[in-house]
A protein has these predicted regions:
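Preference for intrinsically disordered or flexible, low-complexity segments
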Residues: 1-306
Length: 306
């Protein structure tokens, strides 16, 4: 039994399971999105965090259920991305949220994560003449604020727009997803049949012993590296909504993850402020079929903090 084995031996076994999962297809390509403070206002067509959206001439910002304009939290100019098989090759993908949500949730509906009443994901296939009157997010800093930038009592709002640079990376299997423990546990029992973990139960209370064993096995290998990205795996600070909402388990594509950042590691003199509550993160997920059809009406959006 595992109780009688040295920890180093158990750790080697756990590492072997993770390596097996990655070899069998768990590794995913991701594109890291690195924010930077632009020296001058970015073009409306540029990839960016926050800022002024590139809306077609005559087009207005999407609105919440009260008819109030949403604020753009991110815009991806697909042609600027490194070569990938996730995003369209051209066009703009925009992510909008409610800057004046009375519950300070910025449009996240924890009872229905795909409800786009107060958030929106919009894809423009072609770039035409932009609407010069496209607004910046209209943020009520006395209430919920906004993840991008901040507010100084003397100078007012700080940067509400950051540029993006891109870096192709690869992510191995991560503990963040709802099915991680199930996948790891099944592979462990298959690989080490004489050292099986406590039996799995649908009842979460009866499953506690197995969950605790899985946590102890995998905790040493959890990555502490957090970065905004498209593709790869989402990063859930708290719970993966797909665990509760089984109808979302087909949402396997990570359309976008934005994490909290309070500094620029490459330039200490450049202040970056992206903050989801208390150092949280946000994720947008989609099904492969909807993405292939360029249908962004059924995207799951969630954010949470520590």
């Amino acid at each position: 039994m595992l109780d009688n084995k040295p920890f180093k031996d158990i750790e080697k076994q756990a590492k072997h399971i993770i390596d097996l999962l990655n070899q069998e297809g768990a590794r995913k390509k991701a594109i890291a999105l690195k924010p930077f403070v632009p020296a001058e206002p970015l073009p409306q067509t540029a990839s960016k965090f926050g800022g002024r959206a590139d809306l077609p001439a005559g087009e207005s910002a999407p609105t919440n259920e009260k008819g109030e304009p949403l604020g753009m939290i991110a815009q991806i100019n697909c042609a600027e991305l490194p070569e990938n098989d996730l995003y369209p090759a051209t066009g703009l993908l925009q992510f909008w949220m409610d800057p004046n949500d009375e519950e300070c949730l910025w449009g996240f509906d924890y009872e229905n994560p795909t409800s786009q009443k107060n958030f929106r994901v919009i894809y423009y296939e072609t770039l035409g003449e932009p609407n010069p009157d496209a607004p910046f997010p209209n943020v009520d800093w006395d209430e919920g604020g906004w993840p991008i930038g901040g507010f100084d009592c003397e100078s007012g709002p700080l940067e509400l727009e950051y540029g993006m640079t891109f870096e192709v990376r690869e992510q191995g299997v991560t503990a963040s997803g709802y099915d991680y423990y199930d996948v790891f546990g099944a592979k462990w029992d298959e690989t080490y049949p004489d050292e099986k973990l406590p039996e799995a139960h649908e009842n979460p209370y009866k499953n506690q012993a197995r969950r605790e064993a899985l946590y102890e096995l995998t905790e040493p290998f959890e990555s502490e590296e957090e970065y905004s990205h498209v593709g790869g795996y989402p990063f859930f600070v708290q719970n993966d909504p797909r665990e509760e909402f089984k109808e979302l388990r087909g949402h396997t594509v990570n359309l976008l993850t934005i994490v909290s950042e309070s500094e620029n590691e490459e330039n200490e003199d450049e202040e970056i402020e992206i903050m989801w509550g208390d150092a949280g993160a946000a994720n947008w997920l989609i099904t492969p079929e909807a993405l292939a059809a360029r249908d962004f009406t059924n995207v799951a959006f969630e954010w949470s903090c520590g």
